[in-house]
């Protein structure tokens, strides 16, 4: 039996290492930009609805462009595509930093930038995971996906440490640094091999057709249910991220530094979830693993709404990100493993399109917060919550998500029994 040496593992080769490091640097810039924009919007508007709308605008490009990016990623060289997208991200950030420096900004200008940033974010998310698979191949896709997601989380830790300190003093500096991060990540992958080992064989006459993904979904129950579950967790689970600045400020009475700390904590929890994927990546029952992770995430969202003290909030948020990180990685692994090699980009495009359901979750949270803040409730609610609106929204979302995941457990047999 041949020994598996470090040299035979794709993770120890230069192509994957350069991709991993590029993802880390890009993520540092992206998360730093997201934290900074969230802080600035809440500072200039002091409105929960404006913050939630900002997150909605960031996700809108996913609905519009994700399927097309998935098709393009199946047709062109993914290394070049990824490098170009990262470079375009750096250009946008540099221009926005100039606007902030000269104080030429308002809420509308910020929203235009957030939309542009959302375009870059969704395109990179699809392309980098497809390219990671090209390098590591189907045998190591679990570890490859987890490692690139780990790089993303480490980048988030870097961003969390610096972003809160920087944006509270200089609005333009975080965006200028993020522009440099994106530029470096774009350059870093250029020396990689022209063709990766597991890149799909392409027909030059092949043209992207929107009907292809519809045909795949019609005949692939696993991918279809995966996308439905993604929509469910996006609306009622991941949407808690949209009110993180509000939770830190109104529930915990924190400031920009505390928001940065919570960003670090989220990423640390995410890294634990990713390490579990790496350690048990050869486990075949990934569908069952995904459903358990989604259920754990559901309970954590519910209990986050009951967390009034710093310690309880930290423990629940940390646990929530262990489960959500596992879900995120498993979604991408199963999406690619459930289709043929030539359709991986389309599958990831369809999955990313499902992420576009996030704004509906933001809308639900916003409506609940508005209702609670508008109507004069008795002290029955106030005695359990520091900030009744956002906390009650998390309780309701968590409860609904628990029920929906249990229904999926019961009826989604093919996903539950899916083996990679």
Language-model segments: which ranges?
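Short hydrophobic/alpha-helical segments at membrane-entry points of transmembrane helices
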Residues: 18-19, 105-113, 225-226, 311-317
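Structural signature of transmembrane alpha-helices in multi-pass secondary transporters
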Residues: 26, 58, 148-152, 266, ...
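Intracellular juxtamembrane helix-capping segments at the cytosolic ends
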Residues: 37, 123-136, 326-339
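Helix-loop-helix hairpin linking two adjacent transmembrane segments in secondary transporters
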Residues: 102-105, 148, 152-189
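Cytoplasmic helix-loop-helix junction between adjacent transmembrane helices
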Residues: 113-154
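Helix-loop boundary and gating motifs at the non-cytosolic
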Residues: 2-61, 215, 219-266
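C-terminal transmembrane bundle of multi-pass solute transporters/carriers
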Residues: 64-68, 75, 79-90, 95, ...
